[in-house]
């Protein structure tokens, strides 16, 4: 599973953990998250995230 980091605020989306607070189940791949989803911390869109190596 991959991780994606917001380039604005640094918040990290981990595919393995999902984001249940927004209804995104653990194991949800980045490409399966709706395009209108926004960063929970700063509100930017998915285009402002980059895949990171951890």
From Swiss-Prot:
Gene3D superfamilies, alphabetized: 2.20.28.10
Cofactor(s) the record lists: Fe(3+)
Any one GO BP annotation for this protein: alkane catabolic process
Note on cofactor: Binds 1 Fe(3+) ion per subunit.
Keyword annotations from UniProtKB, A to Z: Cytoplasm, Electron transport, Iron, Metal-binding, Transport
Record's note on what induces expression: Constitutively expressed.
Cited InterPro entries: Rubredoxin, Rubredoxin-like_dom, Rubredoxin_dom, Rubredoxin_ET, Rubredoxin_Fe_BS
Reported function: Involved in the hydrocarbon hydroxylating system, which transfers electrons from NADH to rubredoxin reductase and then through rubredoxin to alkane 1 monooxygenase.
Designated name of the protein: Rubredoxin
Organism field: Acinetobacter baylyi (strain ATCC 33305 / BD413 / ADP1)
Lineage summary: Bacteria, Pseudomonadati, Pseudomonadota, Gammaproteobacteria, Moraxellales
């Amino acid at each position: 599973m991959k991780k994606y980091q917001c380039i604005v605020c640094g918040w990290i989306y981990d595919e393995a953990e999902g984001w249940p607070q927004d209804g995104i189940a653990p194991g949800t791949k980045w490409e399966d998250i709706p395009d209108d989803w926004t960063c929970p911390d700063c509100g930017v869109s998915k285009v402002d995230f980059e895949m990171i190596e951890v």
